[in-house]
Amino acid sequence: MSQLPNLISIFRTTLAIGISIIVLRNPENEKILNYAFWITWTVILLDGLDGIIARKLKLESDFGAFFDIACDRITELIFISLFAILRWIPFWILIVFLVRGILVDGIRGFAGKEGKTAFGKKSMMKSKLGYFLTSSRFMRGSYGAIKAISLSFMFLVHSTMPQFLNLEMFLIYLMTFYCVIRGVPVLIEGRRFFN
């Protein structure tokens, strides 16, 4: 029972990998793309569920927080890589997510050595703006919602709703903007861990 949140994280990451492999092999199969839409929503809902279970059952831990973020990053990069490989999005978006992820997660690793976490009471963020952009429920929730919609909707746009491609690309660019704007404070405030 104590590992339930982590098992959910493993399951959702495995689902993302599985559906991405299937879509990669059948990128024009309307039925598969429609399934991918629903499976992506399931992956995203499970991301919220693991945290809720950890809090409700008092199973929160530093490792659990790290593992959740790692699975989030893996899942995010799986979908963005898939979209870039299929040329559904510009390749530079994948580069942005990779570079941001490596830099931010690297700094968070150094912060973790000093007992700081990405979110919560032990957050590494000191400034109010930095905390708001990276750790506030509003920013985490709105970024999560934008990711959920843009990542899942991409499959519908390429199956039954091509008329919404411009809207989908707007959402992808908005998601990328959020990715960058939430990473900048970590880069700025994280410098203190290298002194």
Question: Where do the model's predicted regions map?
Answer:
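Structural signature of hydrophobic alpha-helical transmembrane segments
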Residues: 34-41
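Cytoplasmic membrane-interface "Motif A"-like loop-to-helix N-cap segments
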Residues: 59-61
